[in-house]
Amino acid sequence: MNKSITVDSENRVDFRNNVDYCVGTGRWGLALTEEYLKELEFVQNEIGFKFIRGHGIFHDDLSIYHEYEEDGETKLEYNYTYLFRIIDRFMEIGIRPYLELSFMPSQLAKGTQTLFHWKANTTPPKEYRLWNKMVVDLLKNLRARYGEEVLEWPIEVWNEPNLPGFWFKGDMDEYFKLFKETYEAIKAYDSRFKVGGPAICGVMEEDWIREFLTFCKRFNLKPDNITRHHYTVEFPETIGHYDYSKLEDSDMRIANLQATRDLVDTFDEYKGTPIHITEFSTSYTPRGVIHDTNLNAAFLAHQLSHLGDMNELYSYWTFGDVFEEKGVPNSLFHGGFGMVAAGNIPKPTFWIFSFYKHLKEFSEACVLRDENAIIVKSEEGYAGILWDKDNEDLDIEITLPIENDEYTIIRKTVDEECCNPLKLWHDIGEPAYPTKEQTELIKSCAFPLITSDVLKVEDGKTIVKSTVRKHGIEYFEIKKRIFTPDRGYNYEKVISTH
């Protein structure tokens, strides 16, 4: 497939690149493990997310909520030992919590329904008074330890209450009560905290958003952001441990997000309220095999070029494969949500986030966006990302206006031939538990192919030609060449003499 693009350097595309705003994680308690922290450090060193959002801040494994009997009375105390240990480490790594308030401590729960391998209680509180007290005490203690910056940590009430497994019977009215109680308790403590919801996913999402805003309007609640999730596959076929899904149309899924923006804006009271996509990916299961592929990265390249159009925040689910919703993973590559596999092996998806972060650092002045490319311009030159989510290679020719001079073009390429750790793992026998040597071998082929060239511009423009292989992504930068050769050194003679 062939394609030609001509860039107008004076053109400006309304492109909002918030790729590094937030990233997802498995439950909070996993942050007490060594492998988890190694993966998070690896991600932060290359990409550097601002916030991290995960489940289970009130789950029993963090041991925050305690009821005990004394002198014939039921008394209450809180324990923040593990939570502070986790957040201290987060802050050392350079990331802050996005506070999803979930799930229910077993002593506070009204029922016994649980979810996941780790038994998250997904029932309402037995007393909302005790829930509110716990939430406010949490915020007070966070503020006492970490200062006024805590006021800027976003808060989300629960997770996916429209799904019966995540909230008892998927009871809309009961969730609205939870939101109202929580919102009013937090705002009564300090109105500057930013509180959002309803954190829905997939099922009856339009009805939930409409009814949620109608409820908020009725009770004069003004959520600081509207939260929802965004996944882009059809219902999976499950074989053994694994889920196989077909991707939905990327433009259709972007249109679905725009429909949420449009719906929110039909309410005068909430017009312009920021929308946070607090989870997004392709597959919504932690055994979705597409997550480990090059296609996953190429599909997300297109999504990332549009997610900022209608959403202030979009948080990829998740940064790493330390994750236990369906139990402990059975193998190195298992369709895990993470952009990094065990042993700090970056998957292709890791690199599309890295590329968008580099693009953001290069410039926010977007001069072109289409189905296969996004290009920005700065005083230094140009940078761009190319992708091909189709099943045949794409030969692309880009004409760029640029002043006469010499330039260096650097390309970083990730595709099924040059950066495909999944294939190497498969080729050596799909070891479930790779040895140290095998892990290093797999990791060695998990990095982009870097190439370079010199562009000599003499007529005010240059033409960049690239072949983006199927399911491939490419990042490029074009900057002026600063040539400072030493006396007597001739590169052309070096490479031709021998």
Model-derived regions: residue spans:
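Substrate-binding clefts and catalytic carboxylate motifs of secreted carbohydrate-active enzymes
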Residues: R287-E325, S378, N404-I450
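Carbohydrate-binding surface patches
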Residues: D370-D427, K470-E477, I482-P485
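Substrate-binding cleft and catalytic face of glycoside hydrolase catalytic domains
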Residues: I47-E248
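Mature N-terminal, pre-catalytic/accessory segment of carbohydrate-active enzymes
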Residues: M1-G48, K470, K480-H498
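Aromatic/acidic polysaccharide-binding cleft in carbohydrate-active enzymes
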Residues: I277-E397
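Short, acidic/polar
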Residues: S9, L30-Q44, N141, E206-C216, ...
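C-terminal beta-strand-rich structural cap/linker in extracellular carbohydrate-active enzymes
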Residues: A432-H498
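Glycoside hydrolase catalytic-domain groove-lining segments
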Residues: E39, V233-G288, E312-D321
